[in-house]
Amino acid sequence: MNKGNLIKNYAVALLNNAMVDNIQDKIFEEITSINRIITDNFDIREFLFSPIVNKNDKINAVNSLAKNIKISTIVQNFLLLLVKNSRTAILSNIVDAYNTLLYESKNIKIVQVISANKLQPKEQEWIKSRIEKELNQTTEILFDIDNTIIGGIIIKYDSMLQDYSIKGSLEKIKKALKIVNIAV
């Protein structure tokens, strides 16, 4: 099984368990919080991701962590499953996949908008309304900054990429000039 399918399968299983008790958002908050703790703490991350550390020690650590921060049984059991199957290293990917599935279950599309500079709230609202009108769907927009695009924006969702950046336009011109054998 490829890694993408594996990640999605874990995310689907977690979401399905959360749906039984209608606590999908709570589970997302918990799993995101746990992921942040692991990501931000080098020692915890190395301990849980290390193939050398005994699984029983990892299980004890997860149980202790769950007790200290009071997470749900669903999340605790999910983390224990990841430990038992040696899959803790893909937790961040699973959290991202869970988030995507959660929004899909609410019929909300996640869209990433990349700009060269921080956009003002009015600009963000305008972009959001234009994207929602184009997609005819409610969206959750993730605004990111990448100053290498020089100006404009790049819009990403699903497998779509709409490049309205200056860098993208320059790349297209460069490619067109190469096709007609003009040195760039």
UniProtKB/Swiss-Prot annotation:
GO annotations of cellular component type: plasma membrane; proton-transporting ATP synthase complex
Membrane topology of the entry: Peripheral membrane protein
Keyword Cell membrane: yes
Family, as annotated: Belongs to the ATPase delta chain family.
UniProt keyword terms in alphabetical order: ATP synthesis, Cell inner membrane, Cell membrane, CF(1), Hydrogen ion transport, Ion transport, Membrane, Transport
Cross-referenced InterPro entries: ATP_synth_OSCP/delta_N_sf, ATPase_OSCP/dsu
Protein name, UniProt field: ATP synthase subunit delta
Family matches, as HAMAP family: ATP_synth_delta_bact
Subunit-level organization: F-type ATPases have 2 components, F(1) - the catalytic core - and F(0) - the membrane proton channel. F(1) has five subunits: alpha(3), beta(3), gamma(1), delta(1), epsilon(1). F(0) has three main subunits: a(1), b(2) and c(10-14). The alpha and beta chains form an alternating ring which encloses part of the gamma chain. F(1) is attached to F(0) by a central stalk formed by the gamma and epsilon chains, while a peripheral stalk is formed by the delta and b chains.
Ion transport in keyword set: yes
Pfam families reported for this sequence: OSCP
Subcellular location(s) of the protein: Cell inner membrane
Domain of life: Bacteria
